[in-house]
Regions:
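Short, Lys/Arg-rich, polar N-terminal cytosolic tail immediately upstream
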Residues: 1-6
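Non-cytosolic membrane-interface motifs at loop->transmembrane helix junctions
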Residues: 38-46, 75-77, 100-111
Length: 157
């Protein structure tokens, strides 16, 4: 199944790469300054640096996905995004509602929520197209000659 990657998926990978690179580097290198601009209390900068490193890891996988040619090469990356992005969305929502996340966290909800929707739609689209291209989907059902079918039917009764 060497189904090419759609332009929509390639664009999603590129946007994810760019945003991830920006936010990941800022969190990794200057979490206090970056988050402090938005009123985010950074008591433990090492924790935010770790989040920045994780974001950069997913950013690298999006770059590899952007450069890949086939669905088979990026399927696992999209599945990982379908775990990461919804979890990040829920954690940010929880932080806004139950914890002390500042209002700027709504941007995180929108970004991660947007990636959740985009990767979900593109995953389903590519899986459906890959299934339609599979040899099993293309192969016609084997034909049984009419006489053999009649004999089989009589033998069962």
């Amino acid at each position: 199944m060497n189904k090419p990657i759609s332009s929509g998926l390639r664009t999603t990978f590129l946007v994810h790469f760019i945003l991830g690179l920006i936010f990941g580097l800022l969190l990794l290198l200057i979490p206090e300054s970056f988050l402090g601009m938005f009123g985010w209390n950074v008591a433990q900068p090492a924790t935010y640096r770790l989040v920045g490193a994780a974001i950069l890891g997913f950013t690298a996988s999006s770059w590899f996905g952007y450069k890949a040619a086939n669905w088979d090469q990026v399927r696992i990356v999209v599945l990982a995004e379908l775990v990461w992005a919804p979890l990040a969305t829920v954690v940010n929502l929880w932080g806004i509602i139950r914890a002390d996340f500042p209002p700027i966290a709504w941007i995180n909800v929108l970004i991660f929520g947007g990636f959740t929707v985009a990767f979900w739609i593109l995953y389903n689209q590519h899986e459906a197209e890959a299934a339609a291209m599979s040899p099993a989907a293309k192969a016609p059902a084997p034909k049984v000659p009419a006489r053999k079918a009649a004999r089989r039917k009589r033998a069962r009764h």
